[in-house]
Amino acid sequence: MGSLSIWHWILVIAVVLLLFGRGKISDLMGDVAQGIKAFKKGMQDDDKPADKPEPAKSIEHNAAPTAARSDVGSKAV
């Protein structure tokens, strides 16, 4: 009583075909296949090594000499 016989499965498949139709099921399976292909392609893209970044360019900075401040440590009254 707890197991489904072959007749139960045939009835379930017949109801599914009547509800969805043959065209909708094949379209659905095609969409699933495209999704799997896109997923596999995305996983393969992750395996490729990343492009090596160019080394950073150095910036030459000529700082002008500044005058020393004498009031650095004093408090204003």
From Swiss-Prot:
Membrane topology field: Single-pass membrane protein
Subcellular location: Cell inner membrane
One GO molecular-function entry: protein transmembrane transporter activity
InterPro entries: TatA/B/E, TatA/E
Keyword Transmembrane helix appears in the UniProt entry: yes
Region (Disordered): 42-77
Bias kind Basic and acidic residues: ranges: 42-60
Name this polypeptide is given: Sec-independent protein translocase protein TatA
